[in-house]
From Swiss-Prot:
Gene designation: pdxJ
Source organism phylogeny: Bacteria, Pseudomonadati, Bacteroidota, Bacteroidia, Bacteroidales
CDD domains listed in its UniProt record: PNPsynthase (cd00003)
Reactions mediated catalytically: 3-amino-2-oxopropyl phosphate + 1-deoxy-D-xylulose 5-phosphate = pyridoxine 5'-phosphate + phosphate + 2 H2O + H(+)
Active site: H43, E70, H190
InterPro entries: Aldolase_TIM, PyrdxlP_synth_PdxJ, Pyridoxine-5'_phos_synth
Subunit composition and interactions: Homooctamer; tetramer of dimers.
Subcellular location: Cytoplasm
Name of the protein: Pyridoxine 5'-phosphate synthase
Record-listed E.C. numbers: 2.6.99.2
Key words, A-Z: Cytoplasm, Pyridoxine biosynthesis, Transferase
Length: 238
């Protein structure tokens, strides 16, 4: 069964919009676990416009499910990972001012850098994942780095879903089969929601994990957090 990791960045965005500690990121994350989430994801950025470094430390102390930290692996991020030692680190090639992740790694061009990162994170006992598009050659390069997993960037799937579902998912099916043949685990994330998730999960073989934040938190405004997580888990209970 594919695991659901809830990204709590949007909770931090809401908190920071007003100041103070409402909503409480830690409490929401723990409630997500209690309601059935199988992991918690955060993506701290240098300007701390949502998740703060202090949040990351607080979450590490309290979480009982897998903790996944995403981010651009600059030296500050690497130091944070060394201190926190999450279960998984997802390397994302974000520019500091980007609104949200919008592309995967060109692994061939960044191969030596990613190899060094994977080796470093493995030395600390951390599972690694490289954020990536569906290009098969790029996935082959990712496997050569020694990474444990890739995370497929799913915004193109979500954007094309209502035009032609089969065509939208096909590159991801091929990417998943190829990655699995190379010994890679497969994660996925970006713009997955209650409308498009089941179709994606049903057709994608070997899908280990999805991380979902924006859509899930938006749905929770109407459905409540517990019911929302239940519905997302149902989409993955294949």
């Amino acid at each position: 069964m594919t695991r659901l990791s809830v990204n709590v960045n949007k909770i931090a965005t809401l908190r920071n919009a007003r100041g103070g500690n409402v909503p409480d990121v830690l409490r929401v994350a723990l409630d997500c676990e209690r309601f059935g989430a199988q992991g918690i994801t955060v993506h701290p950025r240098p300007d701390e416009r949502h998740i703060r470094r202090s949040d990351v430390y607080d979450l590490k102390k309290a979480l009982t499910t897998e903790f996944n930290i995403e981010g651009n692996p600059d030296e500050r991020f690497i130091r944070l990972i060394e201190e926190i030692r999450p279960e998984q680190v997802t390397m994302v090639p974000d520019a500091p001012d980007v609104l949200t992740s919008n592309a995967g790694w060109d692994v061939a061009r960044n191969y030596d850098h990613l190899c060094r990162l994977v080796e470093r994170f493995h030395a600390w006992g951390i599972r690694t994942s490289i954020f990536i598009d569906t290009d098969l050659d790029n996935i082959s390069w990712a496997a050569k780095t020694g990474t444990d997993r890739i995370e497929l960037y799913t915004e193109p799937y979500a954007a094309a879903y209502h035009k032609d579902m089969a065509a939208a998912v096909q590159p991801y099916v091929k990417a998943s089969v190829h990655a699995h043949s190379l010994g890679l685990g497969i994660n996925a994330g970006h713009d997955l929601n209650l409308d498009n998730l089941r179709y994606f999960a049903e057709r994608l073989p070997y899908l280990d994990e999805v991380s979902i934040g924006h859509a899930l938190i938006a749905d929770a405004l109407y459905l409540g957090l517990e019911e929302t997580i239940r519905q997302y888990r149902d989409q993955l209970a294949l």
